[in-house]
Regions:
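Gly/Ser/Thr-rich active-site loops/lids in small-molecule metabolic enzymes
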Residues: 240, 244-253
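Active-site microenvironments that recognize anionic phosphate/pyrophosphate groups
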Residues: 1-165, 171-238, 245, 258-263, ...
Length: 328
């Protein structure tokens, strides 16, 4: 049975093709960060306040857990947390209706304790969060209705967080978003696009930290001070195929970069998101492509210039940002 909610609809800007998902129920999300304190649904002992687990990392104690993935109660895509079949969509749509925004939208609850920062999560448990995400992405890679998937985090009110309890979100889309199309197109003209990114960062002293064969670097054109990317040195298109050493490295580096940012700008809000290639059932694996995690501090708001031109302004150069992050 489908959801009783109207399904989300996807509209496109007629001049640029930019997609916009209309999901009115998103306005119903709890807003604990605005001061309306509620019983936290993500804390241990409150599991009945969330949908059932999709996946879970168990704790050593019987019945306990360290991290869990559940359906998002206020999804951007897939109104009931699942992809709807073509027959359902055709039968329900009135003439001229915008296409439904199919997909899956889930919440990754990263700790049973009520903590606000990933820095409060023990390193082994934090690595387990990334392993849980890898497992779920591997499941979605086998679903031919999901073209592409990501994990993203909103940390702090300025980054769009609505609940304090540490968590991230996992989304699978039935289409490939424009930013990934643009990255694939830009990389198609280079024999080794990500290798060039790493080499340039080494030459220009923009490497912040390394672990295993992963590097954390400040990109040459950061959108905000201290923007950092984490990526492997050698090609790997899909995060769910990464080996255990790389998984441990991305966990260690993500905590390291957030810790460095927090020491430079205490309690700084930030977003991050995982970029990987579209799943192979949707498009052939791109040659010499690298999944990468982009960490974007939210230190300056976007104003008319940025929104009207698509250009960003930063107050710290890439090289200076890397030096400050290394020094903390």
């Amino acid at each position: 049975m489908g959801s009783t909610r109207p399904r989300p609809r996807i509209h496109h800007d007629p001049l640029t093709g930019r997609p916009v998902v209309v999901a009115p129920w998103r306005a119903e999300r709890p807003d604990e960060l605005a001061g309306d304190r509620i019983t936290c649904p993500f804390c241990a002992g409150h599991e009945q306040l969330t949908p059932p687990d999709i996946l879970q990392t168990e704790a050593a104690t019987a019945g306990g857990w360290r991290s869990r993935i559940v359906r998002n109660r206020f999804p951007i895509v897939g109104a009931d947390g699942r992809l709807e079949s073509a027959s359902e969509a055709v039968g329900a749509d009135p003439p001229g209706a915008a296409p439904t925004a199919g997909g899956v939208h889930e919440v990754v609850i990263e700790s049973p304790a009520h903590v606000a920062s990933i820095l409060a999560i023990p390193p082994d448990d934090w690595r387990g969060v990334w392993e849980l995400c890898r497992r779920r992405l591997a499941e979605l890679a086998g679903d031919t209705t999901v073209a592409w998937a990501t994990v993203f985090k909103n940390s702090g009110a300025a980054a769009g967080a609505s609940l304090e309890h540490v968590h991230s979100q996992l989304v699978g889309l039935g289409f490939v978003p424009p930013v990934i199309v643009a990255e694939l197109s830009a990389g198609a003209d280079s024999a080794d696009p990500f290798g060039a990114v790493v080499s340039a960062a080494e030459e220009e002293d923009r490497i912040v930290a390394e672990a295993e064969d992963l590097v954390a670097l400040v990109p040459p054109a950061p959108r905000q001070p201290y923007e950092t990317w984490i990526l492997p040195r050698s090609p790997e298109s899909y995060f769910h195929q990464t080996r255990p050493g790389r998984l441990a490295a991305v966990a260690a580096l993500s905590q390291s970069i957030v810790g460095r940012l927090d020491r430079l700008v205490p309690n700084a809000a930030y977003n991050w998101w995982l970029h990987q290639a579209p799943f192979p059932h949707h498009a052939p694996p791109p040659p010499r492509w690298h999944w990468h995690l982009e960490i974007l501090p939210r230190l300056h708001g976007l104003a008319g210039f940025e929104l009207g031109t698509g250009c960003h302004v930063t107050t710290v150069s890439a090289r200076a940002a890397a030096a400050r992050l290394r020094a903390t």
